[in-house]
């Protein structure tokens, strides 16, 4: 019987957090091997585990997968979170890429120099409230279904809800004008697997604090 997936990254959100969320939503238990020093990263590079010399890396089904989107696609396919046909997968990909564009801004926020944080937060608020949230609200309104694609949970829903939580940590009233997104967040959060993941003590990572940022900089700089 195959073992649990093993996630190789530092002990923070970064580019691994969508992978943690998706595995959790699928009800898949996983282990984590945290990078703590530059030497830990060097060891993975030197033993050939990192095809492009970078993490995240996930050991799963006898493979050492890198590149976040490739990992997410594999997990989504394996656990039936990737639509029923090509058209649904195309929509899921399109929506997930939109979420990724917003996530790219959000995940860098803790690493922004103090003097630039105000401008960075303003950008996050603007992009979330005026570009991305309205687009996803419109999708949900257009078909009146519970989820973004095919009226069933997909990796796009999980990723969107993950980023909704992240944005709300920085901008608590971000969803005030988006009732369907709020309903989606609640719906996904109440799924037993996700509800468990949202409880204290789970493998979900908190918003990076100064100590976490310093640790990441030491490993990757």
Curated annotation (Swiss-Prot):
Residues modified as N6-succinyllysine: 4
Enzyme Commission code: 2.5.1.18
Catalytic activities: RX + glutathione = an S-substituted glutathione + a halide anion + H(+); androst-5-ene-3,17-dione = androst-4-ene-3,17-dione; pregn-5-ene-3,20-dione = progesterone
CDD domains, alphabetized: GST_C_Alpha, GST_N_Alpha
InterPro entries the record matches: Glutathione-S-Trfase_C-like, Glutathione-S-Trfase_C_sf, Glutathione_S-Trfase, Glutathione_S-Trfase_N, GST_alpha, GST_C, GST_superfamily, Thioredoxin-like_sf
Domain GST C-terminal, chain residue ranges per copy: 85-207
A GO CC annotation given for this chain: cytosol
Keywords: Cytoplasm, Lipid metabolism, Transferase
Every GST N-terminal domain range: 3-83
The keyword Nucleotide-binding appears for this protein: no
GO biological process terms on file: glutathione metabolic process; lipid metabolic process; xenobiotic catabolic process; xenobiotic metabolic process
GO terms for MF: glutathione binding; glutathione transferase activity
Pfam families per UniProt: GST_C, GST_N
Keyword Nucleotide-binding: no
Subcellular location(s) of the protein: Cytoplasm
Disulfide bonds, paired cysteine numbers: none
Residues reported to bind glutathione: 9, 45, 54-55, 67-68
Family affiliation: Belongs to the GST superfamily. Alpha family.
Its job: Conjugation of reduced glutathione to a wide number of exogenous and endogenous hydrophobic electrophiles. Catalyzes isomerization reactions that contribute to the biosynthesis of steroid hormones. Efficiently catalyze obligatory double-bond isomerizations of delta(5)-androstene-3,17-dione and delta(5)-pregnene-3,20-dione, precursors to testosterone and progesterone, respectively. Has substantial activity toward aflatoxin B1-8,9-epoxide.
Quaternary structure and partners: Heterodimer of YC1 and YC2.
Name under which the protein is recorded: Glutathione S-transferase alpha-3
Organism (species): Rattus norvegicus (Rat)
């Amino acid at each position: 019987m195959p073992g649990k997936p093993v996630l190789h990254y530092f002990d923070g959100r970064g580019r691994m957090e969508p992978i943690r969320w998706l595995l959790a939503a699928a009800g898949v238990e996983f282990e984590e091997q945290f990078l703590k020093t530059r030497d830990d990263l060097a060891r993975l590079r030197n033993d050939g585990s990192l095809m492009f010399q970078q993490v995240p890396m996930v050991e799963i089904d006898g493979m050492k997968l890198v590149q976040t989107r490739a990992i997410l696609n594999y997990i989504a396919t394996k656990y039936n979170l990737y639509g029923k046909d090509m058209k649904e997968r195309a929509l899921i990909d399109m929506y997930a890429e939109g979420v990724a564009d917003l996530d790219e801004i959000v995940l860098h926020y803790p690493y922004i120099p103090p003097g630039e944080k105000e401008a960075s937060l303003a950008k996050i608020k603007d992009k979330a409230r005026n570009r991305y949230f309205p687009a996803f609200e419109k999708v949900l309104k257009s078909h009146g279904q519970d989820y973004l694609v095919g009226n069933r949970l997909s990796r796009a829903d999980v990723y969107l809800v993950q980023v909704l939580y992240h944005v709300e940590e920085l901008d608590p009233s971000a969803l005030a004008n988006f009732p369907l997104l709020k309903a989606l967040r609640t719906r996904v959060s109440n799924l037993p697997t996700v509800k468990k993941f949202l409880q204290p003590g789970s493998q979900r990572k908190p918003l990076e604090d100064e100590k976490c940022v310093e640790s990441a900089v030491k490993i990757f700089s």
